[in-house]
Amino acid sequence: MPLTRLAKLFADNLVHTSPQVIADHPGWLFAQRCEAWWKGQLDEDPVSVLLVYRSPRVKDTSRLYRPVSNLILSANKVEYVARGTRFDPTMIHCDKGTEWMVLRMTQADQFPKDPIDMSEVAKLLSVAVDGALNETIGKGRMAAA
C-alpha cells in the first residue's frame, strides 16, 4: 500500500495505524487514510493522513470522489502536505497528468507541534510518492515541474 511505504520515510518520528482504503476505482481514483501520531505525542489526538490519487476526469464534485470529499469536509482543520501530478498510462486521461496529494486532517483546533519541518516532509514526499505509487498501484512517472 502506498501510504505504508510513505510512512516508512518517517519511521523515526511517526506511529500510525494500518492504512484503510477509502476508494479504489482502477483507472479513476485511489484513496487511503491512516491515523498518525508523532512519537512522544501519543497522548495527543491523532491526525488523519489521507493519500489521494486521481484521474483528471475525477472532479471534487464527482460521485466517485464523494467518500474522499466527505472525509475532508468533516475535518476541523485540513492541510495539504504535498501534491503534484504524474503521467500514469493506467489512469484515464493520463496525458493531462494524474493528480496525487497527501493531506493531514484533525478534529482538534490545531495540529500537534511538529517535531520536523513540514516543508521537509513535503520535499521527501514529493520525491518518494512516484516510487510508492509505481510499486503499488500505478506504473507512471512524475510530470515535469
UniProtKB/Swiss-Prot annotation:
Domain of life from the UniProt record: Viruses
Name-wise, this protein is Gene 70 protein
